[in-house]
Amino acid sequence: MSSGAWAAATGLLAAVASVASDVHAGDALDEDVLAVTRKHCVMCHARVPSHPSFDAPPKQVVLESIGELKAWAPKILEQVVWDRNMPIGNDTGMTEEERGLLERWIETLK
């Protein structure tokens, strides 16, 4: 293999490794976000809420999957991160670190 072909192959491998690393990091961040929303959100914002005050998700907002969280990301940023209206009364004790994680995750979606 010529030195030019070798350099091209090495560059291609580095690019593939970088993309794979980014995908893995994104998956890990998604899992962290899901853990936060399971802890603080889905008792109300589930297809079948477990919170005794709700028979259906408030305002039909379901936050059980990454796809649903992505769809609601602008509202999550507003209600949870900026205005701190959610969780209601912060009954579940969401921390600033958890709010920061949600904000960083939402930034990756842009």
Show where each model-derived region lies.
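Aromatic- and Gly/Pro-enriched helix-to-coil junctions and flexible linker segments
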Residues: V16-K110
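Bacterial N-terminal signal peptides
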Residues: A7-A17
